Swiss-Prot record:
Classification via SUPFAM superfamilies: Phase 1 flagellin
Gene Ontology CC, one term: extracellular region
This protein's record includes keyword Transferase: no
InterPro entries found in the cross-reference section: Flagellin, Flagellin_C, Flagellin_C_sub2, Flagellin_N
Gene that this sequence comes from: flaA
Family label: Belongs to the bacterial flagellin family.
GO terms, molecular function: structural molecule activity
Function text: Flagellin is the subunit protein which polymerizes to form the filaments of bacterial flagella.
Alphabetical keyword list: Bacterial flagellum, Secreted
Cell compartment(s), UniProt: Secreted; Bacterial flagellum
Protein name (record): Flagellin
Species annotation: Aquifex aeolicus (strain VF5)
Length: 518
């Protein structure tokens, strides 16, 4: 029992406890009213730090996903433009295939060329005008564009879209023809000699080198279509190399395709002025295509060029095609797939004099000047092995070792859609390959855009989950558990009620001293 009246210890202790309970109850009340466990740094300093960092990451993830949505929108616009370009290229390819048909006359091919040029202009406009928020997407300027997707520094994805301008679409072309007028003239002039300028011997090879450093080499043993012995030397068709290249899966993977053509012009004039075939004399002319005899005929009288052309076409059956050049003075010989054109002229002179004064078979190459060959009682042979055209999507270097093709390392020259010309059969054939390469480029760009969209969408989905989990982690630290906090509040409330009652009792204790004063 208290016997002092100047200091009521029990009341003081009860009051202190009451104030503590009041403070705790008020804080619990604020937590219940705000839903926050941490109302200030004093409540949980380390918890506040962690919660604020988590909130920062969550905000960054939210904005990063918004950035991803912007990027996906831009890429979808780009993909739509590229899809339109593909449709135009497909139509261009159809027209190039149509132009390659020799049934078309020059006017029809010119009309097809105009259609192709209009399609090319449409591609140009799409490539120049496709944009997102003023940013050009398909003209090559959309390069190394960074999309910041994450909540942290350097969490970016670099996006590039290659140019689809017509001057950027196409392929690399390397063209070579090993025959020259001089070589052919030598064959005709030096009758009976062996010409090895167009041959492949054992150990010879043809090599391709690409810009990424990879290389492919074909040696003469089987890979070029022939078996060679140690001493043998054989004529090699352009068509044989074409078949080898086009059937090689590695080259196909590099986008390499070969095409061969063989068009030879000869200054052949058959009239009474230049060719005098006396009675009893014979001139036998034989043509081979790829080693196969396709035409042979013996003439004992004057023959015109028109008749000679008709004789060849009637007998060769499409394996060798004869026509006249625009001047009407040259014989033009062509093979469908670049096979070797071989010619033999055999003169049987009945009286021993020179009867052939001007059959210029020496100018088998287009545009080359012929020479007069005086032949008596002998056989002359000339060979043109075809023009080899190699085309690819990426730049490459091709070199032949021991064969006439590409004796010096030759890099492909880029030919774009602007170079497409289908006014000739050769141009239409090359145009098909160039457009195929353009389609390959466009499809590559489309797949890259699609892959990037999928990548961004995957990042978006992952970050959406990460944001949810981050928000939950922050909530656990920062927000109040109402069930637990209500229990605490009830406890403090009861303590306050009992504290007030006990403080009243403690304040009454000093009154007991009055009993001693009675």
């Amino acid at each position: 029992m208290a016997t002092r009246i100047n200091y009521n210890y029990e009341a003081a202790v009860t009051y202190t406890s009451l104030k503590q309970n009041e403070r705790l109850m008020n804080k619990s009340l604020l937590r219940l009213s705000t839903g926050l466990r941490i109302l200030s740094a004093a409540d949980d300093a380390s918890g506040l730090f962690i919660a604020d960092q988590l909130a920062l990451v969550s905000a960054g993830l939210e904005q990063g996903n918004r950035n991803i949505q912007f990027g996906i929108s831009a890429l979808q616009i780009a993909e739509g433009g590229v899809s339109q370009i593909y449709d135009k290229l497909k139509t261009m390819y159809q027209k190039a295939v149509s132009a390659a048909n020799d049934i078309n006359d020059p006017n029809a091919r010119a009309a097809l060329q105009r259609d192709i040029e209009n399609l090319r202009d449409a591609i140009l406009k799409i490539a120049q005008d496709t944009e997102y928020n003023g940013i050009r997407l398909l003209n090559g300027s959309f390069n190394n564009v960074r999309i910041h997707y994450g909540a942290r520094s350097a969490q970016t994805l670099s996006v590039s879209i290659s140019s689809v301008l017509p001057q950027q679409l196409g392929g690399y072309v390397a063209e070579d023809s090993p025959a020259t007028a001089t070589d052919t003239n030598n064959v005709l002039t030096n009758i009976g000699t062996t010409n090895t300028n167009y041959s492949v011997a054992s150990g010879d090879s043809l090599a391709f080198t690409f810009t990424d450093g990879t290389s492919i080499t074909f040696n003469s043993l089987n890979q070029l279509g022939y078996d060679f012995n140690n001493t043998g030397t054989y004529i090699l068709d352009a068509s044989a190399i074409v078949n080898t290249i086009n059937n090689n899966p590695t080259l196909q993977g590099k986008g390499i395709r070969a095409y061969a053509e063989n068009v030879s012009e000869a200054d052949l004039t058959f009239d009474t002025t230049n060719v005098n075939i006396d009675q009893g004399d014979e001139v036998t002319i034989t043509f081979y295509s790829g080693g196969e005899l396709v035409f042979t005929k013996t003439y004992t009288d004057t023959v015109t060029l028109d008749q000679f052309i008709a004789d060849i076409n009637n007998q060769a059956g499409g394996k060798l095609i004869a026509s006249k050049d625009p001047s009407g003075t040259k014989l033009v010989l062509s093979t469908p797939n670049g096979e070797t054109i071989s010619v033999e002229v055999t003169v049987n002179d009945a009286d021993g004099d020179t009867v052939v004064s001007s059959i210029n078979l020496g100018a088998l190459l287009q545009g080359a000047a012929g020479t007069v060959v005086n032949t008596s009682g002998a056989t002359a042979s000339a060979v043109k092995v075809g023009t080899l055209i190699v085309m690819g999507s990426e730049n490459f270097t091709v070199q032949g070792t021991g064969i006439a093709y590409f004796t010096a390392a030759t890099s492909g020259t880029f030919n774009s859609l602007n170079d497409v010309d289908v006014t000739t059969n050769k141009g239409a054939e090359i145009a098909q390959v160039l457009i195929q390469r353009a389609v390959r480029q466009v499809d590559t760009i489309r797949t890259q855009i699609g892959s990037t969209i999928n990548n961004l969408q995957a990042i978006y989905d992952a970050q959406a989950v990460a944001k949810d989990n981050t928000d939950n982690a922050e909530s656990i630290i920062r927000n109040v558990d109402f069930a637990k906090e209500m229990t605490e509040f009830t406890k403090y409330q009861i303590r306050m009620q009992s504290g007030v009652a006990m403080l009243a009792q403690a304040n009454a204790l000093p009154q007991l001293v009055l009993q001693l004063l009675r």
